[in-house]
Amino acid sequence: MQFLPKADPEIFAALKKEDERQENNLEMIASENFVSRAVLEAYTSTLTNKYAEGYPGKRYYNGCHNADVVETLAIERAKKLFGSQYANVQPHSGAQANMAVFLACLEPGDSFLGMNLAHGGHLTHGSPVNVSGKIYKPIPYGVDSKTETINYDEVAKLAREHKPKLIVAGASAYARTIDFSKFAEIAKEVGAKLMADIAHISGLVATGYHPSPIGMFDFVTTTTHKTLRGPRGGLILSTLENEKVLNSRVFPGIQGGPLMHVIAAKAVAFQEALQPDYKKYIETVLANAKTLAEVFVKRGYRVVSGGTDNHLVLLDVSVKGLTGAQAADGLDEVGVTVNKNAIPFDKNPPAVASGIRLGTPALTTRGLKPADMETVGNLICDFLDHPNDDKNRTKVKGGIQEMTQKFPMNQFRLD
């Protein structure tokens, strides 16, 4: 950085410390990843200076011809990546994308089905603390108490009983394959619209490692970071018949000018995801997650639902007398970044929780393979076995540092 150190030394110091944190810790938060230098360059471009209210060819400001080129490329690449007729790349986040869809097909007070946050859903799927749970009438569905997988019989029963206008499929802490075809059958029976939130699994869907809802669902939303390895942002996919209503709900419905520098970075990320090596990356993400889950099971820990089909593992740490908060805080101190997470039928409040959520996208981007993930999994277990033993902490921290030094972060930094 050439100008920031002098212009704002306090911000510069904080950014340098964040660089060091990412370099010296193993990032295992399932919703985080590392963008490429190309994505980072697009994100920090002069497009941040340009206002471009409207859509390509229909802007409210002049001087948008370059912005039009960038947004059109992002749209076409997103459509190609997911095999979709329509794409809106303007949502600032996944939450904004979800709200735009709600506004497109629901009126205040209308009911919709969404996965219970306590069972792995997302805030925007009807949590009472979120606007989706305040404006509309959410009907939560959950997982089976024995298998800890989505209870499709319950979904069908609730749909028949409440006749919702919309059924939302998707999760933020669910490690198993989602059967979109079952949701489609249920929605058809009760005459409901369908929305799939694939924020966590979009990279898997794009590469064919998870069934796609495209063609079955009316609306598909996702974030552009997580497994897609793009900038933080949102994306809506649908059919051409929904283009007008969705465009209007994004702008001017809930947003003003789009973030053109972010859209440029999205376009670069979509292009990267269209390359053959991206599919190999997702293969490794899945292999790493499977290895991690297997290590936990071998070491006597309980993995929610017994394993994983995707990029994340939900681990019940209560079997070791720990809360999720204690486990996450302790792991942070030895160099592993995870988040506390509620597990299905959790007796602890969300701020305490009984589990931790771990993901493999960021470490896979960093270069770790299954053999490395086995080492990481064992180090995590070593710590959780004796979290208050100072000698054990020192040993585990040393092992983590060896791993971070083996896989440096230089390739993700701008000079």
From Swiss-Prot:
N6-(pyridoxal phosphate)lysine carried by residues: K226
What is a single Pfam family found in this protein's UniProt entry? SHMT
**GO terms of molecular function:** glycine hydroxymethyltransferase activity; pyridoxal phosphate binding
Quaternary structure note = Homodimer.
| Family annotation (HAMAP family) | SHMT
Provide the function of this protein.
Catalyzes the reversible interconversion of serine and glycine with tetrahydrofolate (THF) serving as the one-carbon carrier. This reaction serves as the major source of one-carbon groups required for the biosynthesis of purines, thymidylate, methionine, and other important biomolecules. Also exhibits THF-independent aldolase activity toward beta-hydroxyamino acids, producing glycine and aldehydes, via a retro-aldol mechanism.
**Name the UniProt record assigns to this protein:** Serine hydroxymethyltransferase
Protein source organism = Leptospira interrogans serogroup Icterohaemorrhagiae serovar Lai (strain 56601)
**What would be the name of the gene that encodes this protein?**
glyA
